[in-house]
């Protein structure tokens, strides 16, 4: 297709050019286990403090006795139609992994796949500018990148960060008695699916976008609280999936207060209209055996894939007040969704 026959920039809806959306594109945990099961001899490096063994949010390399380097990458297909907003969301989501380890970002490089015979280069430029905007908000440079001709639009970042090793937080170091806090509401997958199904009302189009564009920069401050024992962000595997990683890594059971889980406005309305992303079903098929028996409604909430979702924090009861004060001071509603305890059942999550 020549440039003269490409669609006009005003008529383009990016979600129509991809088979999936946002972190809902992630390969399911079960399939990912197969992919990562290497047949090669194990190679270790004592300075690699966090690798993929615990499926944490990023890799951490010990630079010296005090400082570590954090490295992560994240990219996906369009979750919204507007190119600038897509780029901003994708970049915000990628940078989040640095904050989820308790670190601060240093720089980023872009990852771009673009169907050059289907979409004008000017649209890709807007996507990259959205990524630049998110990087600016995080206080870092978009320092370079790599692009390929691809059948569907893809954008994301590889991000480098730093961490004081005393502040390093992981997803598998929670302790019995910890309280669980979530910093963003659930329901992004439901609302973005409503958009893809053309059911989303214009007056609701900002709800998921505003949540996805909110940086998780509070993670760097949360990590400085001594009683915060584990930290992760909630993304494509849904709240249940990332909570399971936290529980299984620390050999604990979560008592989850389902009624306390915050939901985005109108999420339940669109759920009632059947706006359930395919990633929800893939998530449940991958880890449902580790959950208690759930209704379809409960599955749709707990397994809803989030894009640029919030932080899941495990904090000791002694440090809980300090965490609540920090969240309040940063205009984040402190919402306790449950607690962790020594295993008492065959499942890793108990609803209460």
Swiss-Prot record:
Disulfide bonds: none annotated. Keywords: ATP-binding, Kinase, Magnesium, Metal-binding, Nucleotide-binding, Selenium, Transferase. GO terms for cellular component: cytoplasm. Binds 1 Mg(2+) ion per monomer. The record marks 26 as: Important for catalytic activity. Its cofactor is Mg(2+). Pfam families: AIRS, AIRS_C. The keyword Metal-binding applies. The active site is at 23. Synthesizes selenophosphate from selenide and ATP. Belongs to the selenophosphate synthase 1 family. Class I subfamily. Homodimer. This is Selenide, water dikinase.
């Amino acid at each position: 297709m020549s440039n003269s026959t490409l669609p006009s920039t005003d008529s383009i809806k990016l979600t129509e050019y991809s088979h999936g959306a946002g972190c809902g594109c992630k390969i399911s945990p079960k399939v990912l286990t197969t992919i990562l099961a290497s047949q090669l001899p194990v190679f270790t490096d004592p300075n690699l403090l966090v690798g993929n063994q615990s499926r944490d949010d990023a890799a951490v390399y010990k630079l010296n006795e005090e400082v570590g380097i954090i490295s992560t990458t994240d990219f996906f297909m369009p979750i919204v139609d507007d190119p600038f907003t897509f780029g901003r969301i994708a970049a915000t989501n990628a940078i989040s992994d640095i904050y989820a380890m308790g670190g601060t970002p240093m720089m980023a490089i872009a990852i771009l796949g673009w169907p050059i015979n289907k979409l004008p280069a000017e649209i890709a430029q807007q996507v990259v500018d959205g990524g630049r905007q998110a990087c600016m908000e995080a206080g870092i440079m978009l320092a370079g990148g790599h692009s390929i001709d691809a059948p569907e639009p893809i954008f994301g970042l590889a991000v480098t960060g730093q961490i004081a090793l005393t502040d390093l937080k992981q997803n598998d170091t929670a302790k019995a008695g910890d309280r669980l806090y979530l910093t963003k509401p659930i329901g992004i997958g439901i609302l973005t699916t409503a958009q893809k199904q053309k059911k989303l009302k214009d007056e609701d189009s900002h709800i998921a976008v505003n949540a996805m564009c909110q940086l998780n920069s509070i993670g760097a401050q949360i990590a400085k609280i001594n009683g915060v024992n584990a930290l992760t962000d909630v993304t494509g595997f849904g709240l249940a999936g990332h909570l399971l990683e936290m529980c299984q890594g620390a050999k604990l059971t979560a008592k989850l207060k389902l009624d306390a889980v915050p939901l985005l406005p109108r999420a339940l309305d669109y759920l009632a209209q059947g706006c359930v992303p395919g990633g929800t079903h893939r998530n449940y098929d991958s880890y449902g055996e580790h959950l208690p028996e759930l209704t379809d409604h409960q599955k749709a909430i707990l397994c809803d894939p989030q894009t640029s979702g919030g932080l899941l924090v495990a904090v000791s009861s002694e440090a809980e007040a300090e965490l609540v004060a920090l969240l309040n001071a940063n205009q984040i509603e402190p919402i306790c969704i449950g607690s962790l305890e020594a295993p008492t059942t065959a499942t890793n999550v108990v609803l209460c």
